[in-house]
């Protein structure tokens, strides 16, 4: 009976570790973004998704040749953004912004947003990078 109980406890502990691993890796900056690929660009907001666990800002960026690329910017949680003064209504479609962040490891046009500068010059920390991002000072 004691051996059976030990097996059940060990099995439950293993199950918790297996289930928790993907959630932990999802929230690690280094799992999705490349600290060696900082990016900075200006663009036009096309939409904002105010969803958990991360809000997303979609930005059209005009390249030097005139073509337009759509970038997806991962931010912190909506609650984090609210605490920093950013609301869903803060970035209406057409708003020109500057984004500082880090490109995704897979090379897609997806980035971890670190700072966002509004047309009036105000810079907001997007709260997504968290511990593990380069030069974590905020």
PLM regions and their residue ranges:
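Bacterial N-terminal signal peptides
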Residues: 9-20
């Amino acid at each position: 009976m004691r051996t059976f109980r030990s097996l059940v406890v060990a099995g439950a502990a293993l199950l918790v570790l297996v289930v928790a691993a993907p959630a932990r890796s999802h929230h690690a900056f280094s799992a999705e973004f490349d600290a060696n690929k900082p990016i900075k660009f200006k663009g036009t907001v096309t939409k904002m998704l105010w969803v958990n666990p991360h809000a997303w800002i979609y930005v059209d960026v005009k390249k030097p040749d005139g073509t337009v690329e759509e970038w997806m910017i991962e931010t912190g949680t909506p609650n984090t953004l609210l605490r920093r003064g950013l609301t869903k209504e803060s970035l209406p479609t057409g708003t020109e912004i500057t984004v500082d962040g880090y490109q995704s490891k897979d090379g897609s046009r997806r980035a971890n947003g670190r700072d966002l500068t509004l047309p009036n010059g105000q810079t907001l920390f997007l709260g997504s990078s968290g511990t593990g991002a380069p030069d974590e000072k905020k």
